[in-house]
């Protein structure tokens, strides 16, 4: 969206636009056709089943579960100023719990964070390696680790969650415009 706002991308109306989900069309409409959604990623977390069992910890099912003192130093997540994943986490908590409630949630979660990372996927990768128990991540990142054979359980929290829409754009003045149109 930022590239569209800054005039770096050009409008394109794909003949396939009518086949897309509403969430994919929304960025297209909002930018006058300068970007289109290509994936939707829901926020959540994943945990290492083996570490959880070894430490005798209950399986978390909700965002609020992560505030329990049993998870002190068991959670890794990215830092909001360096990671879109963490920024989405902060924004999601505000949307779920209200402004004061969201910031209070983040303060409570901070008490259980072992480490903040620059990358949004670092926490779940560390959980896959057995270095941390829980990683806050877009759920597809946890699923990727699970289907790769790691003992990871992906969680879509019970309270609901936020999400991102990844989008694609054609750069203004693209050298391979026809190829770009086919991709979009």
Locations of regions flagged by a protein language model:
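Extracytoplasmic ligand-binding site segments that recognize negatively charged/polar headgroups
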Residues: 1-131
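A ligand-binding cleft/hinge motif common to bilobed small-molecule-binding domains
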Residues: 1-2, 128, 133-151
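Bilobed periplasmic-binding protein/Venus flytrap-like ligand-binding cleft at the lobe interface
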Residues: 62-69, 167-184
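Loop/turn elements at helix/coil->beta-strand transitions in domains of secreted/extracellular proteins
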Residues: 71-75, 130-133, 150-152, 178-181
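Active-site-proximal beta-strand/loop segments in catalytic clefts of secreted hydrolases
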Residues: 78-80, 138-140, 157-158
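Periplasmic-binding protein-like
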Residues: 105-110, 116-117, 148-177
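Short, catalytically relevant binding-site loops at active-site mouths
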Residues: 123-124, 140-144, 159-162
């Amino acid at each position: 969206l930022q590239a569209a706002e800054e005039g770096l991308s050009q409008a394109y109306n794909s003949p396939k636009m009518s086949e897309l989900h509403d969430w994919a069309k929304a960025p297209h409409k909002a930018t006058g056709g300068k970007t289109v959604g290509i994936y939707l990623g829901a926020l959540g977390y994943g945990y290492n089943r083996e570490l959880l069992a070894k430490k005798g910890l209950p399986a978390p099912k909700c965002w609020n579960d992560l505030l329990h003192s049993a998870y002190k130093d068991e959670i890794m997540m990215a830092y909001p100023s360096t990671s879109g994943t963490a920024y989405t986490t902060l924004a999601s908590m505000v949307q779920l719990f209200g402004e004061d409630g969201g910031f209070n949630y983040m303060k409570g979660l901070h008490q259980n964070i072992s480490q903040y990372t620059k990358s949004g996927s670092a926490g779940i990768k560390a959980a896959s390696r057995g270095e941390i128990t829980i990683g806050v991540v877009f759920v597809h990142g946890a699923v990727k680790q699970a289907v790769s054979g790691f003992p990871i359980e992906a969680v879509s929290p019970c309270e609901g969650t936020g999400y991102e829409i990844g989008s694609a754009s054609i750069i203004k003045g693209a050298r391979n415009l026809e190829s770009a149109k086919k991709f979009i």
